[in-house]
Structures are given as structure tokens and as C-alpha cells.
Curated annotation (Swiss-Prot):
Homotetramer. It catalyses: a 2'-deoxyribonucleoside 5'-diphosphate + ATP = a 2'-deoxyribonucleoside 5'-triphosphate + ADP; a ribonucleoside 5'-diphosphate + ATP = a ribonucleoside 5'-triphosphate + ADP. The keyword Nucleotide-binding applies. This is Nucleoside diphosphate kinase. One of its GO terms (molecular function) is nucleoside diphosphate kinase activity. Pfam families: NDK. One of its GO terms (cellular component) is cytoplasm. Belongs to the NDK family. Its cofactor is Mg(2+). SUPFAM superfamilies: Nucleoside diphosphate kinase, NDK.
Length: 141
């Protein structure tokens, strides 16, 4: 079973859409194996998004991700990484497919509700960034 990391970003939390987003995620067949609410410091957000450090949006991304609480989730499903990317939609909600999480709930490319790992390799790294092995509950169903 494959795992991926999702982060319900500060705009999702501020707009009180945590439940709606998790409902969409679970309805798509994902199992939540770890979840917590946290607030990233600028340093922690910068470390998590270090891969984007040279990109022009890096500073804004770090500011945004440290602007309020967020909810990291470790999700499990066959083909989890690719399926979750499909479920959340394009980074820019204006370009996202109908019915995707970003199309339904996001306001802009910068505040787009949710993060999803972009590869199986990055999913492993990202899950480890937020969760210990002990925090991940094996799916017993």
C-alpha cells in the first residue's frame, strides 16, 4: 500500500474547511493513517519547502505556510501519490478540473488549500518530516 503526505494549508483551516477536505479525501478511498494540527515556524516551513528555495514564490510560500495552523495527514491507498494529485487538482484553482479540492475550495494559486507529495520518493521524505513511525497507524481494516 502506498502512502502520501497531504497538508491542509492555513487557508483551509481559516476557512473552516478541514472537515470538507477530509470528507473528499476519504470518499476517494484514502485512509488517514496519521494526522495532527500544527503551526509551522518560518524556519520549519523554509526547511520543508527548501526544494523551492530558488523559485520566485519561495518567500511568499514560507510566509503563507507559517501564517496559521495547518493539518498534515499521512494518507494510504494503492497509487496514493498520483491519485491524490488528481484529487487535489492543478496548483492554480482556475486551471483545476471540476470537482477537485482546489477547484471547489481554493481562492488562488498562492492560497490553494492543500499540499500533496509530487512523487513516491518525496512522499516518504515528507511523511517523515511530520510523522514518526509510531504515529502512523497501520490500516487494520
Amino acid at each position: 500500500m502506498e502512502r502520501t503526505l497531504a497538508i491542509l494549508k492555513p487557508d483551509c483551516v481559516r476557512k473552516n474547511l478541514i472537515g470538507a477536505a477530509i470528507e473528499k479525501i476519504q470518499s476517494a478511498g484514502f485512509k488517514v493513517v496519521a494526522m495532527k494540527m500544527t503551526r509551522l515556524t518560518k524556519e520549519t516551513a523554509g526547511e520543508f519547502y527548501a526544494v523551492h528555495k530558488a523559485r520566485p514564490f519561495y518567500g511568499e510560500l514560507v510566509e503563507f505556510m507559517s501564517s496559521g495552523a495547518c493539518v498534515p495527514l499521512m494518507l494510504e491507498k494503492e497509487n496514493a501519490v498520483a491519485d491524490f494529485r488528481t484529487l487535489i487538482g492543478a496548483t492554480d484553482p482556475a486551471e483545476a478540473a471540476e470537482g477537485t479540492i482546489r477547484k471547489l475550495y481554493a481562492d488562488s494559486k498562492g492560497e490553494n488549500i492543500v499540499h500533496g507529495s509530487d512523487s513516491v520518493e518525496n512522499a516518504k521524505i515528507e511523511c517523515g518530516f511530520f510523522f514518526s513511525t509510531q504515529e502512523a497507524v497501520a490500516n487494520m481494516a
